[in-house]
From Swiss-Prot:
Membrane topology: Single-pass type I membrane protein
Protein name: UDP-glucuronosyltransferase 2A3
Organism, as annotated: Pongo abelii (Sumatran orangutan)
Keywords per UniProt: Glycoprotein, Glycosyltransferase, Membrane, Signal, Transferase, Transmembrane, Transmembrane helix
CDD domains tied to this protein: GT1_Gtf-like
Catalysed reaction equations from the record: glucuronate acceptor + UDP-alpha-D-glucuronate = acceptor beta-D-glucuronoside + UDP + H(+)
Function: UDP-glucuronosyltransferases catalyze phase II biotransformation reactions in which lipophilic substrates are conjugated with glucuronic acid to increase water solubility and enhance excretion. They are of major importance in the conjugation and subsequent elimination of potentially toxic xenobiotics and endogenous compounds.
Record has Transferase as a keyword: yes
Cell compartment(s), UniProt: Membrane
Paired cysteines (S-S): none
Length: 527
């Protein structure tokens, strides 16, 4: 008996050792807010699988709570700026300025904001890379891989300084410029819409003209406006000339937070992997008070309303417009809202500082989801098959709702010009027209019918990079070409030169023949 127990203990120890043999060390450069909520799911799964995860952050993070006990390790630098200052400016910009502007103007305004805060971002980066004690500690730890959200610059620079292979995680960059220029992503403008334009893959002639012009605008304007700033900083930090695309382009894998249930078909590089909806999970039971309210809706069901974690307040006028529309529908409404109680609020509507959004969307009584179009919320709606009323505010939200609208699972309304009648009409359309629910369920079935779950796919590729010290076999040779080689400008120039030479020689031959013929005729006439 004793020998059997000893054998069992020995076997368990062996299994434990084998398991740890595959464990690695992961360094993380995250972005705050909803980006962090998505990345955190990956990190928690990496920890479950036995990996050691260290997160680089600053003292003024909004959602990255490094003080809370966690299996995650944190390396924190102090930032003196008030953490709410930039956030308040951004919320005002997104709610009151961007929605009323054309695409190109809204992008300029958005980038102006990032230009204003990039001094803070640069300071944060300097706090890490010029902290010799911290950098020495990170180098001695010998990390196997770095997981980076490129929305906040410097992660790729850290990876370069530490000589660690890295994986990027993102939805889209501004105008998709980083994916095209740095990731060498093919993007035929005839059917691939430029991100953040609200266009689809079915474009009219004028829309294709707009798509082409915006592509040029994004490429050259962002290069001049933002990339050069960081390239100077990167070059100084590395002690040699470099470009942002040179460092970002070294990413082994790009984890894109979408999937083909959402995306329009288009070409991608082999090191681009889709992990959209990795944070989604089956609905859990609601709190008792909330469940009672939901059940009181009867056959009419409920509507879930949330503008995300960033936009929990709107102006009093806008709140009354929204509340007035909600009061006129038969469904009960759960609205995530922290502002002053609207005077037009109906008895069918309850306000909450926070709601278990995923659990509500997965509830059988949920009929519709009013959303600003954030990627996390969109995917929770896809996961549970809930049709949407989209109220995009800024950034990729316009694109996200355009995708859902094109797939027949959403109705879009303009946040800036929205009236009670607009919102009421959209809600009635989504809740009474069965095609929206059917299309939402179709997308849900596509999402669930994957050979590998999104979270498992994300973790697999991170572990793959750890095991193989990179994924160079998936890296396109396009990264080694200059821009004129990439677009075959040199080949086109050579062929044009050949054609021009041939035309020149042909013309010369014709002229020579004509001159010869004329001379012969003159001689014959004289004779």
């Amino acid at each position: 008996m004793r020998s059997e127990k000893s054998a069992l203990v020995f076997l368990l120890l062996q299994l434990f050792c084998v398991g740890c043999g595959f464990c690695g060390k992961v360094l993380v450069w995250p972005c705050d807010m909803s980006h962090w909520l998505n990345v955190k799911v990956i990190l928690e799964e990496l920890i479950v699988r036995g990996h050691e995860v260290t997160v680089l952050t600053h003292s003024k993070s909004l959602l990255i709570d490094y003080r809370k006990p966690s299996a995650l390790k944190f390396e924190v630098v102090h930032m003196p700026q008030d953490k709410t200052e930039g956030n308040e400016v951004f919320v005002d910009l997104a709610l009151n300025v961007l929605p009323g502007l054309p695409t190109w103007q809204s992008v300029i305004k958005l980038n102006d904001f990032f230009v204003e805060i990039r001094g803070t971002l640069k300071m944060m980066c300097e706090s890490f890379i010029y902290n010799q004690t911290l950098m020495k500690k990170l180098q001695e730890t010998n990390y196997d891989v770095m997981l980076i959200d490129p929305v906040i610059p410097c992660g790729d620079l850290m990876a370069e300084l530490l000589a660690v292979p890295f994986v990027l995680t993102l939805r889209i960059s501004l105008g998709g410029n980083m994916e095209r220029s740095c990731g060498k992503l093919p993007a035929p403008l005839s059917y691939v819409p430029v991100p953040m334009t609200g266009l689809t893959d079915r474009m009219t002639f004028l829309e294709r003209v707009k798509n082409s012009m915006l592509s040029v605008f994004f490429h050259f304007w962002i290069q001049d406006y933002d990339y050069h700033f960081w390239e100077e900083f990167y070059s100084k930090a590395l002690g040699r000339p470099t470009t942002l695309c040179e460092t970002v382009g070294k990413a082994e894998i790009w984890l894109i937070r979408t999937y083909w249930d959402f995306e329009f078909p288009q070409p991608y590089q082999p090191n681009f992997e889709f992990v959209g909806g990795l944070h989604c999970k089956p609905a859990k039971a609601l709190p008792k008070e909330m469940e009672n309210f939901v059940q009181s809706s009867g056959e009419d069901g409920i509507v879930v309303f949330s503008l995300g974690s960033l936009f929990q307040n709107v102006t009093e006028e806008k709140a009354n417009i929204i509340a007035s529309a909600l009061a006129q529908i038969p469904q009960k409404v759960l609205w995530r809202y922290k502002g002053k109680k609207p005077s037009t609020l109906g008895t069918n509507t309850r306000l909450y500082d926070w709601i278990p959004q995923n659990d509500l969307l997965g509830h059988p009584k949920t009929k519709a989801f009013i959303t600003h179009g954030g990627m996390n919320g969109i995917y929770e709606a896809i996961y549970h098959g809930v049709p949407m009323v989209g109220v995009p505010i800024f950034g990729d939200q316009l694109d996200n709702i355009a995708h859902m609208k094109a797939k027949g699972a959403a109705v879009e309304i303009n946040f800036k010009t929205m009236t009670s009648e607009d919102l009421l009409r959209a809600l009635r359309t989504v809740t009474t027209n069965s095609s929206y629910k059917e299309n939402a369920m179709r997308l849900s079935r596509i999402h669930h019918d994957q050979p590998v779950k999104p979270l498992d796919r994300a973790v697999f590729w991170i572990e793959f990079v750890m095991r193989h010290k990179g994924a160079k076999h998936l890296r396109s040779a396009a990264h080694n070409l200059t821009w004129f080689q990439h677009y075959s400008i040199d080949v086109i120039g050579f062929l044009l030169a050949c054609v021009a030479t041939a035309i020149f020689l042909f013309t010369k031959c014709c002229l020579f023949s004509c001159q010869k013929f004329n001379k012969t005729r003159k001689i014959e006439k004289r004779e």
